[in-house]
Amino acid sequence: MQPSHFSPTSTDAHRFTQALAVGAAPDGTEDAQATYQFRTLWLSDIHLGTRDCKAEALLDLLRHCHAGTIYLVGDIIDGWQLRKGWYWPQAHNDVAQKMLRKARKGCRVVFIPGNHDEFARDFHGLHFGGIEVLSDAVHVTADGARLWIVHGDWFDGVVMHAKWLAHLGDALYIFTLTLNRWLNQARHRLGFSYWSLSQYLKGKVKNAVSYISSFEQLLAEEAARRQCEGVVCGHIHRAELRKIDGSIYANCGDWVESLTALVELQDGTLQLLMWKPSASAPVVLAELPPGSASTGQAEAPTQPQASHVPCAS
């Protein structure tokens, strides 16, 4: 399956380069040390340019983590919402600056656009401030596993064939997030913890559960067809790391609600992390040890070990 051709408008292209250009200057923070060192870091569905993007939490992760390669797996910039009205607060600016600074300091940063930043797909093969733009990619882990990296919207029939319905669904999702924000403000005042209305609805609606299962199966099958041992994707805002019919299926989650990332340790171990800025360490939600591409299943997660290294962020 190949992406549909998209010709960005001049406004789209201007906003894309403008969003990257705002990070041209240093972000004003100098991190003496990074707490965690990873071989690879995957992030998706950040949705910069929206009010529900948790940019401050992401910035905290970027300050504490160093990786040799960072893959931005789509929907990094929310072009759909920016077309409706420009929203770009300082925290979103800081995230862009941090990414560009990492690229300048030698980190390989690869941007794989999704449907919300599809305007960038015509820039395939180009570099902006050291950030490489690709439609998809193949990553080879330390233990030799080939992972196909793609946002995932190519496998969403609504996005590909009924874009008006996709935009309607996005509007309903934004409305749900707004309700969720108000609800959790009230819960916080009453002393209750965070609760996700959108995740609750996804789990209760039969069609949503069926859609997620089909999406995951299709991605795993396509990765195998491409002679890869697994796939890393985003799009559905559902963090996951497991085996499907022998193939690794990894979904980075999002930075709207779940605050999750996929990482590869130096030995090829894959971990799905949930980042909590106030916590002493990220929560490891799932883990696949080296060699899992051929034999293993997800194991009980272990906490990542803090490794103080010179920060290249």
How would you name each of these model-derived features?
Residues 2-17, 133, 200-229, 239, ...:
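Non-catalytic terminal accessory segments
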Residues 40-42, 70-72, 148, 232:
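Residue-level marker for buried hydrophobic side chains located in beta-strands
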Residues 48, 77-78, 154, 238:
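Short active-site segment of divalent metal-dependent hydrolases/proteases
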Residues 129-136, 148, 153, 157-167, ...:
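Conserved beta-sheet core of the metallophosphoesterase superfamily
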Residues 140-143, 239, 243-313:
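Binuclear metal-dependent phosphoesterase catalytic core
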Residues 152-215:
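Active-site-proximal loop/helix segment associated with metal-binding centers of metalloenzymes
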